[in-house]
Amino acid sequence: MAAQVPTEALKELNVGGPATNDKAANPTEGNGVDHDSDDSDEEGEEVAAPAAGGAAKKKKKNKKKKKKKSPTAQSDPPRVLMSSLFPNKNYPKGQEEEYRDENLYRTTNEEKRHLDNLNNDFLTDYREAAEIHRQVRQWAQKNIKPGQTLTEIAEGIEDGVRALTGHPGIEEGDAYKGGMGFPCGLSLNHCAAHYTPNAGNKMVLSQGDVMKVDFGVHVNGRIVDSAFTMAFEPQYDNLLAAVKDATNAGVKEAGIDVRVGDVGGVIQEVMESYEVEIDGTTYPVKSIRNLNGHTIERWSIHGTKSVPIVKSNDTTKMEEGDVFAVETFGSTGNGFVREDMEVSHYAKRGEGHAALRLDSAKRLLNVINKNFGTLPFCRRYLDRLGQDKYLLGLNNLVSSGIVEAYPPLCDKKGSYTAQFEHTILLRPTVKEVISRGDDY
């Protein structure tokens, strides 16, 4: 989920200038696991001692009930609980990369290994969330087709995530334990981020659309944030390739003690080495300079650190223990986004809140606290919980500074934008690209 850079911050960081010369094993897919521990049935007959009349009586067969086998493959659509596919919670690792230069020692350092071993719950939750993201998105990539409504697509992805986490999110507090880390974004063409359909939306995916699919999965508040772009016409291939390569370059550059401004420089250099021809016109691919990657904190999608996607003078260092969403956006337009269209994404702020006078706002805040906490949500999620006539209260929460609204972020109309994103864990011993898969 994209983090937007305030306009005044761009000036302070001196970003957006020309790029300079400053300069993987995939996880197991997890769609099948061996379960050969089922006992074989023992059937038999015992002959009783002869009765008084001399005839032997047979006892009834004592059949043992067959143990129900654990599922070994994901269903289509995905509905098999992830913990059923991995009953020992031995979820696939992400792509592990050794640190470079002065941090290379971390790979074999005993103290760092000990610290890594203390993170068992942290890693288990993250790897489960990542495997759920992989399985749901791979299903989505095979099944999303032009002609579907955006609501169908979003609900298909969200239903899959909820089923695999085992948290449908209907009972009070259930969505807070696991499920969607933030709403499924389906931003089309010039719209780069933060668009998901509200109730009643009839928008249909078309053959000529470029769609960013950005969704999060959380397990116990540990959020995997990963995104990809889909297009159905080959003329957009270079746009998608530029952004995918730029994201991979940013992921490769990231690491402990690396300055985020340098990561942005690497991303921009790769991104802007591409151009794309659309309908006979050639466009340079531009990094969208006021969108950022970001740290992820428990229960909070946007942490305190940002990762620019253009070179900047931001000297903030990445540190051991940080979780980063490295995401990049490329555009054939201005390379700058503005708020546009109807708001769908919201999140409660973590800091202290003002007193509320409106009863509807108080009631809605209680629902948000119990079901989402500081996790982002959308209007459709309130609809699922049976809330109605809540817009007045929701707008009051926004105007009071208690809830933040995230409007769609769009470049100029007629342009096309693309996005790819991975979540990385800066573990004490290695960098783990937790969301890496065979697809991207």
Swiss-Prot record:
A divalent metal cation 1 binds at D214, D225, E421. CDD domains: MetAP2 (cd01088). It comes from the Eukaryota. GO terms for molecular function: initiator methionyl aminopeptidase activity; metal ion binding; metalloaminopeptidase activity. Binds 2 divalent metal cations per subunit. Has a high-affinity and a low affinity metal-binding site. The true nature of the physiological cofactor is under debate. The enzyme is active with cobalt, zinc, manganese or divalent iron ions. Most likely, methionine aminopeptidases function as mononuclear Fe(2+)-metalloproteases under physiological conditions, and the catalytically relevant metal-binding site has been assigned to the histidine-containing high-affinity site. GO terms for biological process: proteolysis. This is Methionine aminopeptidase 2-2. The lineage of its organism: Eukaryota, Fungi, Dikarya, Ascomycota, Pezizomycotina.
